[in-house]
A protein has these predicted regions:
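Surface-exposed, low-hydrophobicity beta-strand/loop segments enriched in small/polar/acidic residues
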Residues: 1-110
């Protein structure tokens, strides 16, 4: 079997992406099969550095309790839900939230 040699490029926690629409500061972006959080606002066609790992607070789907460690997804309204959709998981719940909660901490890309 051949040996493959890799050259270290970067830690991989930050990814720079092209903005195909205006991007808001801390906006959650789908980048291929992962999600990333914009580190700054940028205009359409600009480039923005995004966090591809870490724990972030996002709006949570109303009237849904989510337990710690549950795989979570983005629903059509832009809220975090435990109900799987057609998009990949955003990550896992990093906080336990009741149905009354309006936000949740999520460790992305886990």
């Amino acid at each position: 079997m051949a040996t493959t040699i890799g050259t270290f490029r970067q830690p991989g926690s930050i990814i720079t992406v092209k903005a195909y629409t205006d991007v808001a500061y801390h906006e959650l972006l789908k980048v291929g099969s992962i999600y990333a959080v914009a580190k700054a606002a940028t205009a359409k066609n600009g480039y923005v550095a995004c966090d591809a790992e870490g724990v972030f607070q996002f709006p949570k789907k109303a009237a849904e309790a989510i337990t710690l460690g549950t795989k979570v997804y983005l629903d059509k309204s832009g809220a975090i839900t435990a109900t799987a959709g057609t998009d990949p998981a955003v990550g896992v719940a990093w906080s336990e939230e009741t149905a009354d909660s309006t936000s949740i901490d999520v460790k992305i890309n886990v």
